[in-house]
Amino acid sequence: MIIAVGMSGGVDSSVAAYLLKEQGHDVIGVTLRFYKEECKENARVCCSPKDVQDARIVCDMLGIPHITLDWENLFKERVIDYFIKSYKTGLTPNPCAICNKDVKTAFLGFYLKQTADIDFLATGHYVIKEEGKIKRAKEKDQSYFMALVPKQSLDYLMFPVGYMTKQEIRDIAKKINLPVANKIESQDVCFLKGMDLEDYLSQFIDMTQGDIVHIATQKTLGKHKGIHRYTIGQRHGLGVSYHKPLYVVEKDIEKNILYVGEKEYLLKDAITLKDYNKLEDFEKDNMYIQIRYNSKPIPIKHIEENKDNVIIFLKEPATQVAKGQVGAIYFGDILLGGGIIS
């Protein structure tokens, strides 16, 4: 089979390419370049010029062809612009999930199927695919980021390292002397390039001061430094004095008011998802929703569907439910789908 491997220049995708070549497949390394400048030193991001170079070196060592696609404009239109627009409207977006849908996983696979006649696109994600279904990996699970990937895209996606641990992957890389064997993981939002989120957003959004108001008493407690700097559930950095811990519970973008309150004002017993992406049918029980990467899954009582939204009723109240984040629904370890929290 002809298998393209989305190579980020990291150890996971490099070992994925090696394993597929060892299995006898025709492997092509594909790297996306999203920007031309280098990042800050020690920035834990991917898709930089240095990552492109690392991917090319690995492909040369493995004896497989390597191509680079300059998708800077596409990435800006589909991910960065979405990210900035979301913050401008008071949302807290998840750019990695959007990128997997619209750029580097689902769309890249579709693009290569059309232009290079590949059979599959493989990535280094910690995801298990069994019988066409996406399941949680045993370690460093990244299935949450696949919640928006269309069902039809799964036909041509594969995840060779999904069953492996990070240590097993690094051991293989060291055994075959890959130069990226000890490369640090990319964890930051890549297009921030090591910048602080507030500094990045201040380039595009007017950070005007406004009132911090208690949600229950309606008393003004202080001034915020720009409403877009804060996210739902945030406790630290509010700059107000109060006799109880306070959290960000609501943002009024039009009036530029940041509402805060005690933890009970964060509690939600239902979550609404828009633009729901169905991967599998809902089950009667044992379903959970995950509302942030690495957050604890929340048991679901039942689900109501209508023309525009999916409403998730919870068995226990959830906190830190931020509009704009991805809500991923699971049945046990199986990913059923996901949407944008609204």
Swiss-Prot record:
It is an enzyme of class 2 (transferase). One of its GO terms (molecular function) is tRNA binding. Its main location: cytoplasm. It holds the Pfam family tRNA_Me_trans_C. PANTHER family: MITOCHONDRIAL TRNA-SPECIFIC 2-THIOURIDYLASE 1, TRNA 5-METHYLAMINOMETHYL-2-THIOURIDYLATE -METHYLTRANSFERASE. ATP binds at G6, M7, S8, G9, G10, V11, D12, S13, L32, G124. Disulfide bonds join C99-C190. It is found in: Cytoplasm. The keyword Hydrolase does not apply. Keywords: ATP-binding, Cytoplasm, Disulfide bond, Nucleotide-binding, RNA-binding, Transferase, tRNA processing, tRNA-binding. Gene3D superfamilies: Adenine nucleotide alpha hydrolases-like domains, HUPs, Translation factors. It catalyses: S-sulfanyl-L-cysteinyl-[protein] + uridine(34) in tRNA + AH2 + ATP = 2-thiouridine(34) in tRNA + L-cysteinyl-[protein] + A + AMP + diphosphate + H(+). It comes from Hydrogenobaculum sp. (strain Y04AAS1). SUPFAM superfamilies: Adenine nucleotide alpha hydrolases-like (SSF52402). It comes from the Bacteria. Its EC number is 2.8.1.13. Residues 140-142, 292-293 are annotated as: Interaction with tRNA. Catalyzes the 2-thiolation of uridine at the wobble position (U34) of tRNA, leading to the formation of s(2)U34. The record marks H125, Q325 as: Interaction with tRNA. One of its GO terms (cellular component) is cytoplasm. The active site is at C99, C190. GO terms for biological process: tRNA wobble position uridine thiolation. This is tRNA-specific 2-thiouridylase MnmA. Belongs to the MnmA/TRMU family.
